[in-house]
Amino acid sequence: MDEFHRNGKEDSSWQQCFLYPLFFQEDLYAIYHDHYLDGSSSSEPMEHVSSNDQFSFLTVKRLIGQIRQQNHSIVLFVNCDPNPLVERNKSSYYESVLEGLTLVLEVPFSIRSKYSVEGINEWKSFRSIHSIFPFLEDKFPHSNYISDTRIPYSIHPEILVRTFRRWIRDAPSLHPLRSVLYEYRNSPENLQRSIIVAPRVNTRFFLFLWNHYVYECESILVPLLKRSSHLRSLSHGSFPERTHFDRKIKHIIIFSRRNSLKRIWSLKDPNIHYFRYGERSIIAIKGTHLLVKKCRYHLPIFRQCYFHLWSEPYRVCSHQLSKNCSSSLGYFLRIRMKPLLVRTKMLDELFIADLITGEFDPIVPIVPIIGLLAREKFCDISGRPISKLSWTSLTDDDILDRFDRIWRNLFHYYSGSFGRDGLYRIKYILSLSCAKTLACKHKSTIRVVRKELGPELFKKSFSKEREFDSPPFSSKAAARSQRERIWHSDIPQINPLANSWQKIQDLKIENLFDQ
């Protein structure tokens, strides 16, 4: 990739005029073929790999030539041959064509995103989802409104081609892309439907289409939002006197004009903050009521006219932070009013000011998560633990490992919430369900299982709190841990239980609009 970039410095038009010959490079398909055999980059089951023994690069080139012919367009996504062996061979070649197309288009896209996006006002993307929460903790308390938008994942093929045509002028390379997209759209399974482009589609081709489309939207929207702000994203947490000044300005005494030498101005600095995870993008706005109304009116129009994002009403939600809370990333996001006492001593006088500051307070949805555990047969609908019968065929270590993994991931993900008391209720459900599962497997009772296994039963499982419960940490440290946030930087995606609850919340909003 670096070699491509060095060559691009010498000739800036290489990525626009010389993409099509790369389709016929056998090395690209050899890379995909090796990954396909290893099962590392293909979504097909491993039992289908055995039919790829007679792989021919010449056949792949012929298929590419057939894509160029509109009258003899091949069906890439639907195979009508009843022979399963022939169908698997066809599927392997079609997947190779798509993989080659993806690899070729990824070369200029990767270089463009790497060397241009990071240079736009130091805007960078993070790998850990928990990198979003410190940002929210710093920016949300100083915002008035938020606009929560779910990016549409049904896009017309021609819109995708237009986004590529903005930075690729190589018409022969765009022609196969257009043919593939329309071939997929006109298949019997997707007739009269748009292209499904979303991170939930687990193929490299559609993941690339999704990343490219989102990048095109954000590369224009994010710099525009930054230019619309008068100030950079700064924290006002270290300026309590400014808050005190804004509070007292409401009760200021108006002097006569002849006695006042200067005018007092109370300026509110507008700021707009943006973050996205998956298909959800949130814009937090701080400013006057007029600015908020303008943003709520112009942003949907801007998306529709420039990006062709025709969002349904239920996919766009706007509300005031101080009065409502929103559900995102598996949390209830809200702003909690926190009293702050400031004492100022000047000579022999002591001034005390009572301030009210906003604090970012994400809430863990305990009751919905318990409902999800009941759906997975860890407990009943009232939260009473039951045995996981489907795991009784596993070994004791596997059972302990699975329960431990569920609790550890859940505790890691929700460790940034202040109110973690509800998490220990979930811990109780999982620990007792683990004991009942082992007792059901050995056809005994929980007391007998604990007596036979002794302290080794829960030595490995549910040990995340050792950093708080171990002797080196005092009770004060344990109490302090309840008031501190711990955002882990090794969480690449949303917790499965939190993600399931978030989908249920989105479905409820969609049903409200349908009614």
Curated annotation (Swiss-Prot):
MF annotations from Gene Ontology: RNA binding
Keywords carried by this UniProt record: Chloroplast, mRNA processing, Plastid, RNA-binding, tRNA processing
Keyword NADP appears in the UniProt entry: no
Matches recorded under InterPro entries: Domain_X, Maturase_MatK, Maturase_MatK_N
Principal location: plastid
Superkingdom of the source species: Eukaryota
GO terms of biological process kind: mRNA processing; RNA splicing; tRNA processing
Places the protein is found: Plastid, Chloroplast
GO cellular component: chloroplast
Recorded family membership: Belongs to the intron maturase 2 family. MatK subfamily.
Function per UniProt: Usually encoded in the trnK tRNA gene intron. Probably assists in splicing its own and other chloroplast group II introns.
Protein name: Maturase K
UniProt organism field: Larix laricina (Tamarack)
Lineage: Eukaryota, Viridiplantae, Streptophyta, Embryophyta, Tracheophyta
